[in-house]
Regions:
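Phosphate-group recognition and catalysis centered on beta-loop-alpha active-site segments
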Residues: 1-117
Length: 117
C-alpha cells in the first residue's frame, strides 16, 4: 500500500502550508508519497505549486523526486510535465479515474479501486 499525502498534509488540512515545497519535502522525508497541484505558465515553460492558483514557483528537479504525484491543474503544466519521463503526473477534474504517466489509475475519493489504483 502506498500512503499518499494530499498537498503535504499528513494530519488533516493546513491551508497555510499545503503545496509549499518545504511542507511537501517534510512529508516525503517522513516516508509519504505526496500529491501536489501544479500550474504552468504559458510560453515560459515554468511551473508553480498551488491549489486554486500558482503560488510557489518550482523547478522540474523538485518534481522528479520519487514519491511525488503531480496533479496538473491546466493543460500547460500537463503538457510540459508529460515531456519529462521522470515526472509522475496526471490530470483530471471530476473524472472517476485518470491514468498517470507511470500507468497508475488515480481514483477519486469514494470511487472503485483496482489493482492499478
Amino acid at each position: 500500500m502506498i500512503l499518499i499525502s494530499h498537498r503535504g498534509n499528513i494530519n488533516g488540512p493546513d491551508v497555510e502550508k499545503e503545496n509549499h515545497p518545504d511542507y511537501i519535502q517534510k512529508a516525503l522525508d517522513l516516508g509519504y508519497n505526496v500529491e501536489v497541484d501544479v500550474w504552468g505558465y504559458r510560453y515560459s515553460g515554468m511551473l508553480a505549486l498551488g491549489h486554486d492558483q500558482p503560488q510557489y514557483d518550482i523547478d522540474y528537479e523538485f518534481l522528479r523526486q520519487d514519491g511525488i504525484w503531480c496533479h496538473a491543474k491546466d493543460i500547460t503544466s500537463f503538457y510540459n510535465m508529460s515531456k519529462d519521463k521522470d515526472i509522475h503526473c496526471f490530470s483530471h477534474d471530476q473524472d472517476e479515474v485518470a491514468l498517470t504517466t507511470k500507468g497508475y489509475f488515480w481514483s477519486g475519493w469514494g470511487n472503485q479501486l483496482t489493482k492499478k489504483s
